[in-house]
């Protein structure tokens, strides 16, 4: 289907700067397409129980996917394992690589009639001052403020877990690990 875009479904992780990172096999159709033409549109959507699916929020990121330098491979494998434990079986296969999208345009739809283009300069943050201290931030939060993590998880996602722990910080907040989800 040369010259035609090809939609696909793939899991992803986000980089600290909000960049999208996928882990894909060289045999996959979407990897072949990335190598032939890196221009891509990556849509993230929220699935809710609303009757009118047009009321669901979604965002389309437009940009180019490029293979990530192998120097980051172990870091990204750990991150993928933490966020998507089901990916473990793929992590040691030799034909899988990480690809990161360089985002050029962002289309946000918050529901029917709530539509707009976002400025990618406002979306991406290349100067992450706290990055060298991420481990210390996480350790401090887990040791001294675990009640806040547990309360936030309960309030935002209705997940009750007294053992919830912060696992990663990003420019939007943080990720938690929970025994209950």
Predicted regions and their residues:
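Short small/polar-residue motifs
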Residues: 8-10, 83, 160-165
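An N-terminal domain-cap segment
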Residues: 1-35, 43
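Coil-to-beta-strand transition motifs
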Residues: 16-20, 56-58, 180
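A generic structural motif
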Residues: 13-16, 69, 107, 170
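Well-ordered beta-strand positions in beta-sheet-rich domains
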Residues: 7-9, 58-62, 117
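C-terminal edge-of-domain segments
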Residues: 89-181
């Amino acid at each position: 289907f040369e010259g035609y875009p090809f939609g696909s479904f793939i899991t992803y992780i986000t980089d600290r700067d909000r960049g999208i990172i996928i882990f894909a096999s060289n045999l996959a159709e979407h990897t072949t397409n990335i190598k032939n033409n890196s221009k891509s549109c990556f849509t993230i959507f929220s699935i809710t129980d609303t009757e009118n699916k047009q009321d669901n929020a979604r965002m389309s990121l437009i940009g180019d996917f490029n293979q990530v330098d192998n120097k980051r491979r172990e870091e990204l494998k750990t991150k993928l394992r933490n966020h998507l434990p089901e990916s473990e079986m793929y992590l040691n296969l030799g034909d899988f690589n990480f690809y990161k999208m360089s985002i050029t345009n962002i289309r946000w739809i918050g529901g029917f009639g709530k539509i707009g283009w976002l400025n990618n300069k406002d979306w991406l943050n290349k100067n992450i001052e706290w990055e060298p201290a991420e481990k210390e931030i996480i350790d401090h939060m887990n040791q001294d403020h675990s009640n806040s993590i547990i309360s936030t998880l309960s309030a935002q996602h209705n997940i009750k877990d007294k053992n919830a722990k912060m696992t990663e910080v990003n420019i939007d907040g943080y990720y938690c690990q929970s025994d209950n989800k």
